[in-house]
Each structure stands twice: as structure tokens, then as C-alpha cells.
Amino acid sequence: MNEKANAKCACGCSLVKHTDLIKKAEAHGRFNVVCKDKDGKIKWQDTIDNVVTTLGKNLALDTFLAGSGYTVTGPYMGLISSVSWSAVAAADTMGSHAGWTEAGITNAPTYTTRKTCAWDAAATGAKALSAALVFTMTGAGTVKGCFLVYGTGAVTTVDNTDGTLYSAGVFTGGDKVVADTDTLNVTYTASL
């Protein structure tokens, strides 16, 4: 009896372990704006995904990581006018932002003061305003966007150039016309 058996077996296995787990923190912010007329009816709503300026990032890092006591001045929120508009840039500062002007006293639309931000506790990598900030228009015009200023010298006075510009941005849906007595209800969420 001649029996032959040829047994063949092939088996493969591989294990790949990803050792370069990287988390990247980038500063982002989003303004949500609702415009209401004098009777409280919604006229329009839009969002702004903003530019966090280089100086704003630097102040945030110095504040977060300095290891000493620090009391924040501000932040205060203001509005960007369509007057003399060209662009928002990461290199903008409160003293030098040639691509845009602040709405308020000199440039339409007009309102009385920048608004003071009050925050909820941070959660899931984000920090949001605890309530919408309300801007009541005292004169008609076209609003382009919003900005945040804080740090040493920052104040609620419209057109003041002190403090550090943290962020600025324009509406995703284009310019927005507002009338005298309209209100802009603005929320903001910052995330890393």
C-alpha cells in the first residue's frame, strides 16, 4: 500500500500598533447672530467662523501657561462695519486692522458700547457665553461681523484701540443690513 499525503497549511497574521497618536489643539470660535426688529420678530440669522489672531493666541497661551495669578480684563464684543471693508487677518491687532473698521460711533451701524462677555464653564473642549449679548442699534447701516478684545487696556468704549484683539470674523451669508432699534443677539463659543 502506497499512500502519500501532502498536507499544506498557510496562516498569516499581522498586528499594527499606531504609536503616533497626536492631538492637535487649534483655537476656533463661532459667533451666532440673530437680528430682531423693534417688535421682536426675527429678520435674519447667520454664523461667523472667526479668525483667532496671532496676538490673541499668544495672550491666551501666556495666560493659560504662565503659572501666575491673572485676572482677565474683558473680553468685550464689538461689531464690524461694512465701511472701508477688505479683510480680517491673523496679523490684525486692535491698533492696526487696516482691512476693517468697528461699527459704532464713527462707522454705521451705530450702537452704544461693546458688550461684556460672561462665560459658562468649559466642557468638551469648548467654552460658550452664558447668555446672548444684545446690541441695540441706534442708527441704521450694514454690519459685516463681530470681534472680541481682551487683556490689559481693553474697555467697552467703541473705537478704543487698547487691549488685544482675540478674534474677528464676518458673516458666512454676506453683509447684513440693520435698522435703527433692531437688536443683534450674539452668542460665541470658543473651542480647542
Feature-to-residue mapping (PLM):
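Small cysteine-rich, disulfide-bonded extracellular modules of the LU/uPAR three-finger superfamily
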Residues: 1-144, 150-192
